[in-house]
């Protein structure tokens, strides 16, 4: 390799098979034809070990996030978690909860050697959850409660768009009150959401007025959104300058392109889970994963934030934020373009956002919690 890489996490959509049929599924798991075609090309157990687990350490990977579809529908799901542990990786499992029994939770927890994080999706804790998911949130809440009782670490993914603007404050507050860390994922046009992007995707104005104020409030999900108005020198201080090429790490902040990467069920590699099926850097069956990273123009671009265009390229927060690369692609057709949903319009890098002080203050709280509570775990308030 020409560079040393320090990626942290692989988001692996190990299958498109699912036991639900969410109408806006990002991985098209509600489309029987797409699932059938994908099933024939799914990486086998041996291929996953050879092409992913055996090579990912070379680019710094520490965590395997197993997703789908519904990952646990794979007959080898438990074996894959055991293999990941054998190779020294921690494991997270994204699940809808429908097939995740207490016995399975215990088995996966044991297979991960106690490192397991269970991630569920809750877009709203009210009835609006059913707009974008196949049912209400009771099932996900039950899984979270069971994990809490068993001492298994928990996480929540909140898909953000027009569908939950009104309920977002209550949803995030519920997660905070229950000590559950979360990340926001923007509604995009990948998969079955393609024809509904205009209907559900948030606008710049909605991000500024409704979404961003709520995301700024809570340290539980503090690193996982854009725009991220952190004082660059503050991150440099806490991270001691740790970067994956130019992408800030320890902790990772802003856009996660460049600190994690995604692999689809068929072996295609992308810099972001939202960009799978849209941005293909190569296939692990055809080329070793480290070589894909090293030779792919896509990865070499996203790892070098000096190449960002438009206002993202003249912004004080160019490196600590990076703008959402998915929004750049879906709105402007270029993953290195400016993020058009960002409401900050700097004239040059000297201009500060009015939210920098608030962002920096809660960032310090976030760093304190992570260093004292551990990965993906925030202690519940007394």
Regions found by a protein language model. Name each.
Residues 6, 21, 60, 112-114, ...:
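Short loop/turn motifs at secondary-structure junctions
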Residues 34-38, 90, 111-256, 260-269, ...:
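Radical SAM enzyme [4Fe-4S]-AdoMet core and its adjacent flexible, acidic
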Residues 17, 21, 25-28, 258, ...:
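Cys/His-rich metal-chelating microdomains
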Residues 1-4, 274-382:
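Flexible mid-to-C-terminal extensions adjoining Fe-S/redox cofactors in radical SAM and related proteins
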Residues 1-116:
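Conserved alpha-helical substructure of the radical SAM core
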Residues 11, 15-18, 247-250, 265, ...:
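Residue-level signal for mature regions of secreted extracellular proteins and peptides
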Residues 24, 63, 117, 181-183, ...:
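Residues at the N-termini of beta-strands
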């Amino acid at each position: 390799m020409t560079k040393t890489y320090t990626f942290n996490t692989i988001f692996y959509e190990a299958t498109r098979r699912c036991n639900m049929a969410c109408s806006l599924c990002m991985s098209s798991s509600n489309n029987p034809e797409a699932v059938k075609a994908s099933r024939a090309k799914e990486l086998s157990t041996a291929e996953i070990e050879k092409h992913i687990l055996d090579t990912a350490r070379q680019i710094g990977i520490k965590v395997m996030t197993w997703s789908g579809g519904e990952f646990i529908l794979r007959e080898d799901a438990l074996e894959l978690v055991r293999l990941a542990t054998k190779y020294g990786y921690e494991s997270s499992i994204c699940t809808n909860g429908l097939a995740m029994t207490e016995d399975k939770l215990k088995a996966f927890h044991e297979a991960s050697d106690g490192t397991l994080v269970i991630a569920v999706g809750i877009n709203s804790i009210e009835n609006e959850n059913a707009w974008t998911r196949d049912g209400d949130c009771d099932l996900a809440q039950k899984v979270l409660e069971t994990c809490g009782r068993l001492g298994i670490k928990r996480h929540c993914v909140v898909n953000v768009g027009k569908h939950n603007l009104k309920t977002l404050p209550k949803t995030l507050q519920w997660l905070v009150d229950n000590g559950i860390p979360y990340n926001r994922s923007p509604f995009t046009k990948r998969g079955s959401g393609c024809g509904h992007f205009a209907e559900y995707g948030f606008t710049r104005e909605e991000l500024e007025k409704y979404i961003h104020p709520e995301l700024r409030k809570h340290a539980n999900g503090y690193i996982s959104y854009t725009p991220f108005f952190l004082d660059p020198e503050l991150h440099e201080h806490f991270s001691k300058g740790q970067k994956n090429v130019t992408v800030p790490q320890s902790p990772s902040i802003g856009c996660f392109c460049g600190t994690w990467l995604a692999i689809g069920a068929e072996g295609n590699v992308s810099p972001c889970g939202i960009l799978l099926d849209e941005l293909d850097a190569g296939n692990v069956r055809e080329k070793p994963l480290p070589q894909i990273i090293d030779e792919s123009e896509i990865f070499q671009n996203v790892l070098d934030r000096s190449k960002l265009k438009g206002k993202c390229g003249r912004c004080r927060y160019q490196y600590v934020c990076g703008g959402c690369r998915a929004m750049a692609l879906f709105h402007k057709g270029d993953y290195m373009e400016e993020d058009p949903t960002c409401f900050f319009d700097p004239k040059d890098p000297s201009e500060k956002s009015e939210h920098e002080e608030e962002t920096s203050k809660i960032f310090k709280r976030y760093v304190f919690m992570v260093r004292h509570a551990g990965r993906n775990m925030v202690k519940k308030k007394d």
